[in-house]
UniProtKB/Swiss-Prot annotation:
The gene is petB. This is Cytochrome b6. InterPro entries: Cyt_b/b6_N, Cyt_B6_PetB, Cytb/b6-like_sf, Cytochrome_b_N_euk/bac, Di-haem_cyt_TM. Its cofactor is heme b; heme c. The 4 large subunits of the cytochrome b6-f complex are cytochrome b6, subunit IV (17 kDa polypeptide, PetD), cytochrome f and the Rieske protein, while the 4 small subunits are PetG, PetL, PetM and PetN. The complex functions as a dimer. The chain crosses the membrane at residues 32-52, 90-110, 116-136, 186-206. Component of the cytochrome b6-f complex, which mediates electron transfer between photosystem II (PSII) and photosystem I (PSI), cyclic electron flow around PSI, and state transitions. Gene3D superfamilies: Cytochrome Bc1 Complex, Chain C (1.20.810.10). Its main location: plastid.
Amino acid sequence: MGKVYDWFEERLEIQAIADDITSKYVPPHVNIFYCLGGITLTCFLVQVASGFAMTFYYRPTVTEAFASVQYIMTEVNFGWLIRSVHRWSASMMVLMMILHVFRVYLTGGFKKPRELTWVTGVILAVLTVSFGVTGYSLPWDQIGYWAVKIVTGVPEAIPLVGSSLVELLRGSVSVGQSTLTRFYSLHTFVLPLLTAVLMLMHFLMIRKQGISGPL
């Protein structure tokens, strides 16, 4: 086992990486409220795992979506638990994100030289809310359908381009299969990918610049 470790150590300098990770200075003013960002990340990872599990059974069509969700809840082993965890962690992620934003703002964590960290954080906040909007429609029940109809109809009030934006969001003039397909793609592929990339950038900048000092 030691020879295997030495082989990797010689090529990757594992010990140096571990030392760099574990020896980072933590300011004495840091308290439990500085963990809110990490809790948000944990909720995101739970979302990815539970959401991936549900993709094995969910069917993104207007005729089968609701029935497939019911199947997950009543027939799949622990399906009710997986979906419930997904919903609970979604609510927790939004709450932790909001508290994290307030904590950073109130402690001045957005000030120079951490402006870009703040910008990526704000974008991540928008993506988090977008997860909620797109995921809400996927069961394709009455609540989800009318929520999508209202949300996608909001841009229509924008002069000149409003109607085009509505059609872009819905995939057609009215809410239907194209809308569900778009929201499913956004919820399961586009948004998770963007969130993962921005989270990586966010944490690398925090790692580089360190935690902001007390006010």
